[in-house]
UniProtKB/Swiss-Prot annotation:
Organism the protein comes from: Acetivibrio thermocellus (strain ATCC 27405 / DSM 1237 / JCM 9322 / NBRC 103400 / NCIMB 10682 / NRRL B-4536 / VPI 7372) (Clostridium thermocellum)
Official protein name in the record: Small ribosomal subunit protein uS3
Entry superkingdom: Bacteria
Subunit: Part of the 30S ribosomal subunit. Forms a tight complex with proteins S10 and S14.
Key word RNA-binding present: yes
């Protein structure tokens, strides 16, 4: 039975980058790892309504730099920057380290797989039909320039006694092509019948390697000489 590997993890070091960037010796590694997990969990729970897609963490000496990618940065920053300042103080109290927070706005949230998955999950919690929620999200993504999108919902859909998986796709999703820029998101919907898992894959096109300028110049010169 074939299993789907996380498309982001498969492409790390090829066309995707790490979400955590730091080096540590054996003594500090586990401490930093647990601290990263706690930071991500705290920010996600506190600012879930801001549409947070990704949290990047960098470390240097006693400083922690956090880059938050959000669809609604205004909810995080708050009036006059009060919200982000309060968040920084809470994180400093939790980690006992100097915290620097940077907010990056997601320009097109309809093309961000994590945000799309969370939107579908929130609609399922409001008892909206899973087919309607999935198809609307797919139509919006395709209209805004996605090359392909696939959505899957698993669990006791519509309160059914036997759990099942329903999935729809539109366009192409080349999961085996490593140069394909595929975004992946996962969210859970808490319903009265239990949890439903929501997965979203969005294909945005191929990431082609940059052509070296010197090679292009040599070709131009050879054409002129000919």
């Amino acid at each position: 039975m074939g299993q789907k590997v996380n498309p982001h993890g498969l492409r790390i070091g090829i066309i995707k980058d790490w979400d955590t960037k730091w080096y540590a010796n054996d003594k500090n590694f586990s401490e930093y790892l647990v601290e990263d997990f706690k930071i991500r969990k705290f920010i996600k729970n506190k600012l879930y309504s801001a549409g947070i897609s990704r949290i990047e963490i960098e470390r240097a000496a006693n400083k922690v730099k956090i880059n938050v990618h959000a669809a609604k940065p205004g909810l995080i920053i708050g009036k006059g920057g009060a919200g982000i300042e309060e968040l920084r103080k809470q994180l400093e109290k939790m980690t006992q380290k100097n915290i620097l927070i940077n907010i990056t706005e997601i320009k097109v949230p309809e093309l961000d797989a994590q945000i799309v998955a969370e939107n579908i999950a929130s609609q399922l919690e409001k008892r909206i039909s899973f087919r309607r929620a999935m198809k609307q999200a797919m139509a919006r993504a395709m209209r805004l320039g996605a090359k392909g999108i696939k959505t899957a919902v698993s669990g006791r859909i519509a309160g059914a006694e036997i759990a099942r998986t329903e999935h729809y796709h539109e366009g192409t999703i080349p999961l085996q092509t490593l140069r394909a820029d595929i975004d992946y998101g996962f969210a859970e919907a808490n319903t009265t019948y239990g949890k439903l898992g929501v997965k979203v894959w969005i294909y945005k096109g191929e990431v082609l390697p940059a052509v070296k300028k010197d090679k292009g110049r040599k070709e131009e010169i050879s054409n002129v000489n000919a």
